[in-house]
């Protein structure tokens, strides 16, 4: 019964995500990152901007949280945050910056408060920056849909990959496709990223309003 409930929660999250796909304008490949110099508070107390985190070969931004089964895991899904550390280390090895962004403004008094972010980062041994996106401003500017949702920019802040970390969510997959890991390797070698766009899967970002922004 617990197994069924978890699967129902994940399916419900997918349903909510699909209902909100068209609400926010989406960054597309070759678009430039907005809000490059806006500072956000990290769980270590420091302030970071996208510009300060970008390295010589780019920056990876992953919208994440403390509570979504796609991030933290469930009985039938390990959770993508278990890959964060290895992806972060691979990014560093290829001179690429890396940041986790929590935009769940609608849960700031609950599981995604700043205090809970600090606690979660310690429990999961996060070594990468994990920042608060106040009022989900960055998520809105990016058009971020889900937790997780990946945006990978090159050294000029041009978007070169966006979507999912891999295809492990797909129970019918014929092979494993580590999209983000492959994108990091390709960018590190100066090669073209293929595919450069995949469908993000996860829980919908918990914004405080569903009113579209122009």
Can you annotate each of these PLM segments?
Residues 49-76, 184:
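Short active-site neighborhood of thiol/selenol oxidoreductases, capturing the structured segment around
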Residues 1-28:
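Bacterial Sec-dependent N-terminal signal peptides
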Residues 71-123, 137-139:
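Structural microenvironment flanking redox-active thiols in thiol-disulfide oxidoreductases
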Residues 152-214:
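Thiol-/selenol-based redox modules, centered on thioredoxin-like
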Residues 56-59, 93-98, 125-129, 155-156:
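Loop/turn elements at helix/coil->beta-strand transitions in domains of secreted/extracellular proteins
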Residues 24-51, 79-80:
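N-terminal "domain-start" segment that seeds a small globular fold
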Residues 116-154:
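Short, internal strand/loop/helix patches
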Residues 65-81, 150, 203-206:
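Short, thiol/selenol-centered motifs that function as redox-active sites or metal-ligating centers
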């Amino acid at each position: 019964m617990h197994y069924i409930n978890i699967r129902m929660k994940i399916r419900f999250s997918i349903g909510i995500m699909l209902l909100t796909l068209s609400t926010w304008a989406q960054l597309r490949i070759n678009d430039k990152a907005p809000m490059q110099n806006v500072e956000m508070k990290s769980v270590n107390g420091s302030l970071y901007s996208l510009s300060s985190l970008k390295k010589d070969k780019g920056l990876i931004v992953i919208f994440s949280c403390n509570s979504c089964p796609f991030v933290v895991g469930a009985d039938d899904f390990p959770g993508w945050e278990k890959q964060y550390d290895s992806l972060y280390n691979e990014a560093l090895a290829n001179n690429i910056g890396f940041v986790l962004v929590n935009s769940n403004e609608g849960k700031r008094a609950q599981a995604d408060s700043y205090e809970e972010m600090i606690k979660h980062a310690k429990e999961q041994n996060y070594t990468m920056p994990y920042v608060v996106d106040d009022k989900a401003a960055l998520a809105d500017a990016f058009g971020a849909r889900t937790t997780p949702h990946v945006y990978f920019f090159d050294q000029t802040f041009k978007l070169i990959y966006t979507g999912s970390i891999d295809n492990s969510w797909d129970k019918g997959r014929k092979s494993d496709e580590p999209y983000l890991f492959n994108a990091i390797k390709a960018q590190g070698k100066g090669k073209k990223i293929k595919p450069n766009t995949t469908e993000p899967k996860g829980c919908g970002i918990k914004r405080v309003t569903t009113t579209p922004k122009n």
